[in-house]
A protein has these predicted regions:
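C-terminal cap/linker of serine protease catalytic domains
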Residues: 121-152
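Conserved "turn/edge" positions that cap or connect secondary-structure elements
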Residues: 7, 47-48, 113-116, 123-126, ...
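Core segments of cupin and vicinal oxygen chelate
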Residues: 8-50
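Vicinal oxygen chelate
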Residues: 4-11, 14-15, 41-46, 60-106, 110-114, 120, ...
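Terminal peptide-recognition signature
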Residues: 6, 21, 45, 86, ...
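Sec/Tat-exported extracytoplasmic proteins
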Residues: 25-29, 90, 137, 148
């Protein structure tokens, strides 16, 4: 199967965005800056082993929430790390673990176990967890677990 690489269109902030993302994710690197650093045409970078390309394409296209990147976090510390890092500097918190970073790119910052709470064998617990999630911006694993278990 051919390799697939997300190609992200920015309006002059490709290098800044790539540097932010690389600073937040482990096993991440700036692989190539195409053009002059500081006014790059594009940036090839790797986020936790996955290749990406960012292009300074101009104002013609904007990101929408119809496309987002999901981060499956192992624990609350990871949720907090990505949430704080991606909303810093003008990002916008959203509902149910969604956010928009300061470049307009949408992310879902979710605990890895979210699916087991929302789709677990206990239908009433799943409904409680979903209701709890609907009231959250940043997801709080302990609150989701307590809702699922009927302790909230």
């Amino acid at each position: 199967m051919p390799a697939t690489t997300p190609f992200l269109w920015f309006d002059g902030t490709a290098e800044e965005a790539a540097r932010l993302y690389v600073s937040l994710f482990p096993n991440s690197t700036i692989d190539e800056v195409m053009g002059t650093p500081g006014s790059a045409m594009g940036v090839r970078f790797t986020l936790d082993g996955a290749p990406f390309i960012a292009l300074n394409g101009g104002p013609m296209y904007q990101f929408t929430p119809a496309i987002s990147f999901q981060i499956a976090c192992a624990d609350q510390a990871e949720v907090d790390h990505y949430w704080e890092g991606l909303t810093a500097g003008g990002g916008e918190p959203g509902q149910c673990g969604w956010l928009k970073d300061r470049f307009g790119l949408s992310w879902q910052v979710n605990p890895a176990q979210l699916g087991s709470y929302l789709g677990g064998s206990d239908a009433a617990g799943a409904a409680r967890a979903q209701q709890a999630m609907l009231g959250m911006g940043k997801l709080v694993i302990g609150d989701l677990r307590r809702a699922y278990e009927g302790e909230a």
